[in-house]
């Protein structure tokens, strides 16, 4: 049996500000060479957890291991392997994108002469490198942040909301770039987001945070196996439809929201249920076969409401 190698591990990682616990005993496991998506509403504790991994905030309790080593040991060696964006990247507004990266490269050290140019090309800013940062769009600023994080070719990327502010084309490009970086270069990527559809498309593993707790950690392939198929009816009266399912077919595996009833029980055909609804005077305006996605799963896990 192969032992999984983790690039990031936390054990009972906790952060308190006064009497408020913002991260509560989380145990994260980020496999080497994989993309780990950390999901959660704003205020769930995602950014604070990432800050503790980078020593931008210090744990109240618990430990962090990077590359199998306690991050308090050999700190400079460990962090030379890490690139990161936490919250909004900071740059000099009166300097060009290229000049900003040159300064950061000198401060960081270990960046090859071609590293800055290559990073700008990878994120699609090579033609804009002489433009002053204050003239960059929000999406361009976000790309420059990613360029700063990758210019020293790190083994681990920690990215807090990296697609924030990007248009659909930019999101697609960054998604493709991160996937390529992971699958071709073996870079481990730890990414936070509240955009469920984007995480679902690129992540190998997801963790879900809610009110400071890590409530789930699961391989995306396993999650897809769990997602259940269902038939959805839009009807004139959902409560009557529910009573029909219970009395006529003894069904209990369904949900009702207003005039939409979602049936997970396939003991009866869709045609039979449709006829029974019609016989009881219900108007059916839509029938659709589908299966639950990551958003459905997330909503059930944290009690509905989605991510805001």
UniProtKB/Swiss-Prot annotation:
GO biological process: response to antibiotic
GO molecular function per UniProt: ATP binding; ATP hydrolysis activity
Function of the protein: Essential for high-level bacitracin resistance. Part of the ABC transporter complex BcrAB. Probably responsible for energy coupling to the transport system.
UniProtKB keywords: Antibiotic resistance, ATP-binding, Nucleotide-binding, Plasmid, Transport
UniProt xrefs under Pfam families: ABC_tran (PF00005)
Name of the protein in its database record: Bacitracin transport ATP-binding protein BcrA
Domain ABC transporter per the UniProt entry, residue ranges: 8-236
Originating gene: bcrA
Induction: Transcription is activated by the regulatory protein BcrR in the presence of bacitracin.
Residues where ATP binds: 40-47
Cross-referenced Gene3D superfamilies: P-loop containing nucleotide triphosphate hydrolases (3.40.50.300)
Gene null: resulting phenotype: Disruption mutant is sensitive to bacitracin.
Family: Belongs to the ABC transporter superfamily.
Assembly mode: The complex is probably composed of two ATP-binding proteins (BcrA) and two transmembrane proteins (BcrB).
Keyword Transport found: yes
């Amino acid at each position: 049996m192969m032992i999984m190698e983790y690039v990031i591990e936390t054990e009972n990682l906790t952060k308190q500000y006064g009497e408020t616990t913002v991260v509560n005993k989380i145990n994260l496991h980020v496999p080497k060479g994989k993309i780990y998506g950390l999901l959660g509403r704003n205020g769930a504790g995602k950014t604070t957890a990432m800050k503790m991994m980078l020593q931008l905030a210090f744990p109240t309790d618990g430990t962090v291991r990077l590359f199998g080593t306690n991050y308090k040991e050999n700190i400079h060696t460990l962090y030379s392997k890490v690139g990161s964006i936490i919250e909004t990247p900071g740059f000099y507004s009166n300097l060009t994108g290229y000049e900003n990266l040159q300064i950061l490269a000198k401060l960081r050290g270990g960046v090859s002469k071609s590293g800055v140019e290559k990073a700008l090309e990878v994120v699609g800013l090579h033609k804009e490198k002489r433009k002053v940062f204050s003239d960059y769009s929000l999406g361009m600023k976000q790309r420059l942040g990613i360029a700063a994080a990758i210019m020293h070719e790190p083994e681990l990327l920690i990215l807090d909301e990296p697609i924030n502010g990007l248009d659909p084309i930019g999101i697609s490009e960054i998604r493709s770039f991160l996937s390529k970086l992971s699958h071709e270069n073996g870079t481990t990527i730890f990414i936070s987001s509240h955009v469920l559809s984007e995480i679902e498309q690129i992540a190998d593993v997801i963790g879900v945070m809610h009110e400071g707790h890590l409530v789930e950690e699961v391989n995306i392939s396993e999650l897809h196996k769990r997602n259940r198929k269902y038939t959805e009816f839009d009807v004139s009266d959902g409560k009557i439809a529910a009573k029909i399912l219970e009395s006529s077919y003894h069904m209990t595996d369904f949900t009702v929201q207003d005039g939409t009833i979602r049936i997970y029980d396939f003991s009866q055909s869709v045609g039979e249920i449709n006829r029974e609804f019609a016989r009881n005077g219900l108007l059916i305006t839509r029938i659709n076969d589908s299966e639950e996605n990551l958003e459905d799963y997330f909503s059930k896990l944290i009690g509905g409401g989605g991510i805001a």
